[in-house]
Amino acid sequence: MFRRLLIATVVGILAAFAVAGFRHAMLLLEWLFLNNDSGSLVNAATNLSPWRRLLTPALGGLAAGLLLMGWQKFTQQRPHAPTDYMEALQTDGQFDYAASLVKSLASLLVVTSGSAIGREGAMILLAALAASCFAQRFTPRQEWKLWIACGAAAGMAAAYRAPLAGSLFIAEVLFGTMMLASLGPVIISAVVALLVSNLINHSDALLYNVQLSVTVQARDYALIISTGVLAGLCGPLLLTLMNACHRGFVSLKLAPPWQLALGGLIVGLLSLFTPAVWGNGYSTVQSFLTAPPLLMIIAGIFLCKLCAVLASSGSGAPGGVFTPTLFIGLAIGMLYGRSLGLWFPDGEEITLLLGLTGMATLLAATTHAPIMSTLMICEMTGEYQLLPGLLIACVIASVISRTLHRDSIYRQHTAQHS
């Protein structure tokens, strides 16, 4: 047991450095090509001329597509999905290291050029890749899946500063592939990755700064639960839209470079209306949580961002949809809160409360992982007072969504790339 905990610690350290490496590479490319050192792609888009804002995501998609197509022709193999750590956990615990690194590089290109796709998917993949590489050299074959799971959880902890949610992500989303006794090393890896990541970044701040002064009462629990019902209905709709967009892009029968370029061009067009569509949505989420906008502003940004996410994911841009889903959930919750706020004197607090609830419940509705989703929002914001209400709402959202749409967002993604 001590040996496993020691290896889990090493895996956590490797994962933290893998995540930090991707993050610093992303910042470097943003500085080189966008003249942006703020770390915010929305700020970068705001400072660009309209024609550069239009073309940059398309050029990034074109470059990523050329890279993927070149690799495919070189190896005569069809590329794997960028989240192939899930496939590795469900099969024999082995990676195609070269293909995974190429996918990560392609993800780096589309992320830094403004596509509305998550950077964290590549971060988690690289963390799992580092763990797998270490495991194959120093551990027996029957343990390889465990260390990939530890690496993925550690990568998620380092990317989102949420070690418990990262651990439960593995336990819930991949339920049945791990023994409960194996959760110990997973948690150790996740916590170590968070601590090392904090040392690298010289910060232990929460991912999102929220000033929620409300004391949750009976009325608030009712609103939280009703938001869970709403998210349970919206989750399957989002998954259906993503699947339809993917089929639409595939039906065009374009070569990968042109398909990704088209997705990027759509993002560029939308960014002419609002630069908030650029990137994974992190900075927009933070700005909404700091000062919730008016109803019509939320609605406008939400529609543009939703179309950008659908275009990016539908075109096959390598990356995750975890963080974009958080923004969509936040916007749905805030739209609901703004509508209800017309009838309550504390409309601002209700909007913020239901925005956080929307983040958790839509995540639960799309991942079918209610416990992970609840802990994720609590760990990212520090608002643990919401935990009981969020847990109930997330379970409701997950049950409704699972009833209406059998597959989670991860199973749907795997099916699209199989």
Curated annotation (Swiss-Prot):
Probably acts as an electrical shunt for an outwardly-directed proton pump that is linked to amino acid decarboxylation, as part of the extreme acid resistance (XAR) response. Belongs to the chloride channel (TC 2.A.49) family. ClcB subfamily. Keywords: Cell inner membrane, Cell membrane, Chloride, Chloride channel, Ion channel, Ion transport, Membrane, Transmembrane, Transmembrane helix, Transport, Voltage-gated channel. It comes from the Bacteria. This is Voltage-gated ClC-type chloride channel ClcB. The chain crosses the membrane at residues 5-25, 54-74, 146-166, 168-188, 222-242, 258-278, 291-311, 316-336, 352-372, 380-400. It is a multi-pass membrane protein. One of its GO terms (molecular function) is voltage-gated chloride channel activity. It holds the Pfam family Voltage_CLC. SUPFAM superfamilies: Clc chloride channel. It is found in: Cell inner membrane. The gene is clcB. NCBIfam families: PRK01610.1.
